[in-house]
Regions:
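Aromatic-lined, polymer-binding surfaces characteristic
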Residues: 1-161
């Protein structure tokens, strides 16, 4: 990316084509961490290499991402709001869906729905379960994984709101 050397695009497009050949509702969907990493990686790669991708690759990649992102959105909508504890969602999955939403918001209409949901949820509940002193019970291990998400999301919300 930074060097603009063609070899990086060539390698990236091979990986993107491989990932778009996978069934987004199949084995790669079993684990939320793996699924969200595939979604985010494709979203960031398509954003970086947009001008170099041919229309078929763009379409295939966007379709793969949308199936995965809509899967998270539909699964968590009206569920996460009422769930007392689901820290992995807050630490990783919403973070990855957020990055995916930002990367695709000019290309995929659903991305604005994902982004709005995350924004409203973030304002209403973040940090999760910390609205009262002493409410955090998940331990320092979970706290340690959250700073990147907190910094990233807070900075982006300030820029786009």
């Amino acid at each position: 990316m930074l060097t603009k050397e063609q070899k990086y695009f060539n390698t990236s497009v091979k990986w993107m084509r491989e990932a778009t050949s996978w069934d987004p509702k199949g084995l790669t969907r079993i684990n939320d961490f793996g699924d969200s990493m595939i979604m985010e990686s494709l979203a960031l790669a398509v954003d970086v290499f947009w001008d170099q991708l041919n229309p078929k690759d763009r379409s295939d990649i966007l379709n793969q991402i949308q199936v995965r992102a809509n899967g998270f959105y539909e699964h968590w909508l009206n569920y996460l709001e009422n769930r007392n504890s689901s820290m992995h969602v807050w630490q990783h999955i919403l973070h990855r869906l957020f990055l995916t939403s930002v990367a695709l918001m000019d290309e995929v209409p659903d991305a604005l729905n994902w982004l709005e949901y995350i924004y409203e949820l973030w304002l209403a509940q973040h940090p999760k379960m910390a609205e009262e002193d002493g409410a955090w019970f998940n331990g320092t291990g979970n706290v340690g994984t959250r700073p990147a998400t907190i910094r990233m999301a807070s900075n982006w919300w300030a820029k786009i709101s």
